[in-house]
């Protein structure tokens, strides 16, 4: 357990941007590089690219408008375990080292535009949808192994064995584990002590209803929600639904929620800018940093 006084504590951004392809999520997230620290220097930004190089084009736009991209470092991974390793490095203030062409860590520290060891003020995780998909696929492979054991035990051969193994699906306990992994990720992000922006794809929101035959069916509500780890929206402070206006083609953002009170829920931002939230950073002057440790695993052990 940990306690603190309710005054003079720094506020960090924890923002989720979700939407369809070409809705401007990555471009908006990379505006973290435009932010200024309380000492006037530009943010150092760590970018985790799980979308297969989608960040690269947006970084070129930053260079075109004069941003020193030496203050940005990009990590390419689709592994939740590797992402957790990066977050642990930030949380522990470990040194970041360059990687060689084979993906092996070297002994050369990563440096920023000032020639100092790189340590991020913010992190952009571009593609939480991918991390959920790879985690889900990993659990599906585990389910296949379970079914292989069952097939061996039942003495199945030929087509029956094939169907038993390849027809494996996630079980209830797998979904519980997947949801736990998502919650653990968000709590890890809130515990690293820097500003966080996440992106996710969108999907149709559905509800379960009875059809005329008395069967449960999924029916779309017409709303778009994030396609990522379940419960992700509860822990973040700000959520923007990104979309492209069908008539004008302009990039817009609907404010789903904003605990920082920079904008109100329901506001529609045309040509949105993340710099609206620079005021949150500016108010941190003379305030103490308070990092709430992620004790989810420890809490489970305690219970």
Regions found by a protein language model. Give the residues of each.
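C-terminal regions of RecA-like/P-loop NTPase motor modules
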Residues: 1-2, 9-13, 22, 248-303
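Conserved P-loop
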Residues: 2, 6-118, 122, 130, ...
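A short beta-strand-to-loop transition that corresponds to the Sensor-1 phosphate-sensing loop
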Residues: 51, 126-127, 198-203
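Switch/connector loops and helix/strand junctions flanking conserved nucleotide-binding motifs
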Residues: 55-58, 130-135, 140, 205-212, ...
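Glycine-rich, phosphate-binding/catalytic loops in enzymes
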Residues: 64-65, 139-143, 214-216
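Short, solvent-exposed beta-strand-terminating loops
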Residues: 123-151
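Substrate-engagement module of ASCE P-loop NTPases
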Residues: 147-203, 225-238
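Phosphate-binding/switch region of NTP-binding enzymes
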Residues: 187-275
């Amino acid at each position: 357990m940990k306690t603190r006084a309710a005054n003079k504590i720094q506020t960090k951004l924890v923002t989720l941007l979700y939407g369809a392809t070409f809705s401007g999520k990555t471009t908006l997230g990379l505006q973290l590089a435009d932010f200024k620290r309380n000492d006037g220097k530009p943010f150092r930004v760590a970018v985790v690219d799980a979308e297969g190089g989608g960040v690269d084009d947006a970084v070129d736009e930053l260079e075109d408008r004069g941003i020193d991209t030496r203050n940005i470092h990009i990590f390419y991974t689709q592994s939740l375990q590797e992402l957790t390793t990066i977050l642990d490095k930030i949380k522990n203030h470990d040194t970041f080292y360059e990687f060689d062409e084979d993906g092996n860590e070297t002994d050369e520290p990563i440096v920023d535009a000032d020639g100092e060891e790189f340590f991020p003020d913010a992190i952009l995780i571009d593609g939480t949808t991918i991390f959920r998909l790879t985690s889900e696929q990993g659990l599906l492979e585990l389910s296949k192994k379970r079914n292989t054991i069952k097939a061996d035990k039942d003495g199945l051969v030929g087509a029956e064995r094939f169907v038993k193994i390849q027809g494996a699906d996630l079980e209830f306990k797998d979904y519980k584990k997947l949801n736990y992994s998502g919650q653990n990720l968000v709590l890890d992000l809130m515990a690293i002590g820097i500003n966080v922006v996440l992106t996710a794809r969108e999907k149709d929101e559905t509800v379960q209803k009875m059809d005329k035959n008395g069967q449960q069916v999924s029916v779309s509500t017409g709303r778009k929600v994030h396609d990522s780890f379940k419960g992700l929206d509860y822990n973040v402070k700000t959520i923007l639904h990104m979309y492209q206006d069908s008539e004008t083609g302009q990039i817009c953002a609907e404010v789903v929620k904003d605990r920082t009170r920079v904008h109100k829920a329901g506001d529609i931002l045309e040509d949105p800018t993340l710099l609206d939230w620079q005021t949150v950073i500016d108010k941190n002057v003379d305030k103490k940093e308070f990092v709430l440790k992620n004790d989810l695993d420890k809490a489970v052990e305690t219970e």
